[in-house]
Amino acid sequence: EMPLIEGLIAIGPQLQKEYPGKKLLLIANMDSNVRDIMRREEELRKYYAFAFPSLKIIEDTSDKAKFPLLAAEHGLNVPQTLEIDFSGSLEDELAKLEQVNQPFPWIIKPATSAGYERLKWPGKAKVYTVSNKEEAQTLLANLYQHTHNNPHARRFVLQPRVEGNDSFNLSVTAYVDQNLRVTMLGSAQVLLEDHSPTALGNPVAMITEPYPRLYEQVSSFLKGVGWHGFANFDFKVDSRTGIAYCFEVNPRIGRNSYYNTSAGMNPMRFFVEDVVEGKAIAPQRLGKRVYYSILPKRLVLRYVDKQMGKKIKTLYRLKKNHDPLFYPADFGFSLRGLKRFAYVMIARENHWRKYHRNYPVAKFRQGETRSLDTAALTQP
């Protein structure tokens, strides 16, 4: 069932009457919504204008076993990946472990969420970490047993864990127009992620900066697969080797895409020029450094090293800091404005409690506390 899509189709004629001669733009920032839109593309295009990759590209890139093959073919660096397929015998899949020549720990996770996410058993997780071959064998045997009657949940991938704290994560946002031109590329270093269970992994503090060599990889991949629309890439630099690996690409604009606007490059401009105006806009690459965060500065400083702390303080001093929730026009002298201001300030301060509960400083200090120095990545 796709109630959202059915609703969009049902309301389409009414919206066209309300806005005659106007293009109705359809944007999504959930992968599931993008898939549903492209499954009903022909019906939706009667009323709406949108830009997404084909359904095949979406499905291939969201499959964690297929994506590494596609990435390698088109110049995108990914971790070594081994597919585990339980459609055959368990013994054959366990024998594949001999092919892995990477150090422990290893990560094991479902190739696709479809099918797997509906299963329940004690100890089930979205991602598993194993510290030796015996643990890997035990886990695979357990997964084989619990997915036995579910053919859509029997494929997994095994990868070496890429080491590094939150600051070793990088975000790249791209837009590809209908002529396969990568018109926009923006990026940022993640300093701190959300560690609450319902929002785990979402960046909450970032510094924007260009990564020319990653831009080359991203452009090669997007052109090679025939992408159209927004793409959001997640990279991580291995703290041991300094090599940047791509973990996934989402066929949509990211939740934190406002970091691009903060740095002077509004992603919506590229979308509108392509889909509404049909113009071949000149390609742009992000160049400005700004600090983007929804957290109190003092809280973030607890989770970065001294060098990174100096960068943050310098950007504050230069007034190059942005909080997407802190919009002065929302805080007018009215009851509504005062309520909005109170909500934003309370939400900011509430992060102290959330991090104390979910990611205390003591836990951060148990691992590597060095922040990633991105100087090499910003060079052409």
Please name every model-derived segment.
Residues 1-88, 92, 113-118:
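Conserved N-proximal alpha/beta basic substrate-recognition cap immediately N-terminal to
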Residues 60-156, 179, 213-215, 380:
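Active-site nucleotide/adenylate-binding loops and adjacent lid/helix of ATP-dependent enzymes
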Residues 131-195, 209-216, 237, 244-245:
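Phosphate-binding site of ATP-dependent enzymes
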Residues 152-157, 230-233, 281-286:
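Flexible, glycine/charged-enriched surface loops at secondary-structure junctions
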Residues 192-203, 250-264:
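Glycine-rich phosphate/pyrophosphate-binding beta-alpha loops
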Residues 197-200, 208-233:
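Oxyanion-binding "anion nests"
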Residues 222-258:
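Conserved metal-phosphate-binding beta-hairpin within the catalytic cores
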Residues 272-380:
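Peripheral (often C-terminal) accessory segments that flank ATP-dependent C-N-forming ligase machineries
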